């Protein structure tokens, strides 16, 4: 006899992970494969990062710092903000989920581009909200004017993937700032900068600076890609204290494990 589940999950497609490299080699009789599907770094973490991970193994009988204080302080120093303006999560994906939980209700909407990161539509389904998918501009980037035009009184969250996954098109900080000027200043905007480290534009990094003066803006980043820490799951967000309080209100008490915290902290030193 099946269990009775929430009506909300009926429309959520089950995530089907790709085959592991071992499964692909076994299925096709290969001796090696090059995996590109998940945008993972082909390089392992730095030796210094491996060393702090090894040292941290002795303390696995203890809970991690639930507030990730050392990591928050280091990230706050890097971004020239107060530690209360930094949120730390089990990957930046968790912070995006927390944003949906904290902001969305049935009858509200979340606006995102299409195609973009496949996780965004799930936020609406998981919370009973409605997802508004705005087609990309002809250049493959976010059509920010169209996204602004899609905002109405039901909109609670706008997500901008910058550079966009999967097209790789980057919107400048000036374009993001112009978009912020077009929408209500109390409408939450999350800029997902998972691929920030691969941007060559001269204004790279300035979007996170906007978060110092735009209380409705949260910028998320991850240690998975450039730092090679996919397997440890650690990411962070820079935003107003109001944004961070909202995210902290819905997170688990010990959401970022100890090894992830020390590995991320050491990664910032290199």
Predicted regions and their residues:
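Short conserved AdoMet
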Residues: 29, 58, 104-105, 152, ...
């Amino acid at each position: 006899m099946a269990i009775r589940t929430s009506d909300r999950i009926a429309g959520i497609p089950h995530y089907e992970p790709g085959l592991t490299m071992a499964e692909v080699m076994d299925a096709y009789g290969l001796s090696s494969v090059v995996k590109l599907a998940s945008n993972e770094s082909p390089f392992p973490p730095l030796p210094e990062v491996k060393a702090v991970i090894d040292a941290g193994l002795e303390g696995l009988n203890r809970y991690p710092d639930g507030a990730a204080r050392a990591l928050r302080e280091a990230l706050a120093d890097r971004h020239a903000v107060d530690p209360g303006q930094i949120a730390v999560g089990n990957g930046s994906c968790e912070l995006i989920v927390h944003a949906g939980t904290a902001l969305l209700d049935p009858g509200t909407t979340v606006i995102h581009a299409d195609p973009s990161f496949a996780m965004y539509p799930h936020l609406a389904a998981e919370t009973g909200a409605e997802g508004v998918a705005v087609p990309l501009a002809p250049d493959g980037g976010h059509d920010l004017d169209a996204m602004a035009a899609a905002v109405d009184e039901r909109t609670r969250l706008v997500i901008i993937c910058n550079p966009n996954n999967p097209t790789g098109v980057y919107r400048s900080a000036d374009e993001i700032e112009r978009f912020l000027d077009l929408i209500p200043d109390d409408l939450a905007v999350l800029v997902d900068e998972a691929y920030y480290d691969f941007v060559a534009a001269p204004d790279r990094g300035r979007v996170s600076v906007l978060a110092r003066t735009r209380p409705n803006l949260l910028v998320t980043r991850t240690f998975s890609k450039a730092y090679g820490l996919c397997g440890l799951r650690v990411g962070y967000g820079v935003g107003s204290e109001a944004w961070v309080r909202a995210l902290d209100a819905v997170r688990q008490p010990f959401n970022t494990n100890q090894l992830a915290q020390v590995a991320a902290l050491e990664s910032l030193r290199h």
